[in-house]
Amino acid sequence: MITSTLLKEFTKELGADLCGIASIDRFGDCPTGFHPTDVYRNTNSVIVIACRIPGSSMNISSPYPYTAIENIVSARISQIALSLTLYLEKNGYHALLIPSDPYDYWDAETMTGKGILSLKHLGYKAGIGTIGKNSLLCNNEYGNLIKLGAVITDAVLTADPIVTAKLCKDTCTLCIDSCPVGAIGLNKVVSQKKCREFSEINNKRGIEIYACHACRSVCPNRNGR
């Protein structure tokens, strides 16, 4: 029998910096089509893992190191999630990796994409952190410099407490004010069209690079508390 403690130790051995668990009863407020049981009907637990992004990548003018780091960390998370899925199956459970990309929902006019499940909302429900005004999940130890992955499973696991402490100060609007294209609203909603058109660009070789991370870098909680 797998326990939450054993599972977390396993994810740390694989290279995850954080691991949180949510029970399925926490997802009653999910939109239709984006509930974990809409993906796998026998889901009992949602496991969320996170790997941190090196803070030094925020302090350079060239977008290429940050882009490379984003891609490397994303690939690492996918590998950890796959290994976790196989580990659960080996122990007699069903499990499914939830990718951040590719995803099915896409509105071309607004350039709005939605993952099959929202990883940041899964992370919140699993106690990884809280969602900041910049719409990024913010962890107390690593701030918003984290990338997320998830696995849903029929294993019944002990859930972690949801983080109730507010990391964003009521009076702070640094991320909103610093966005070059005004993509961040006061209600934690980001205009994906404005953000993508400015921050996701193709260089002369046709390679996509991430040209802006202002909302991450100006946050006082960028590196955690």
Say what each PLM segment does:
Residues 1-77, 82:
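Non-catalytic, usually N-terminal nucleic-acid engagement modules in DNA/RNA processing proteins
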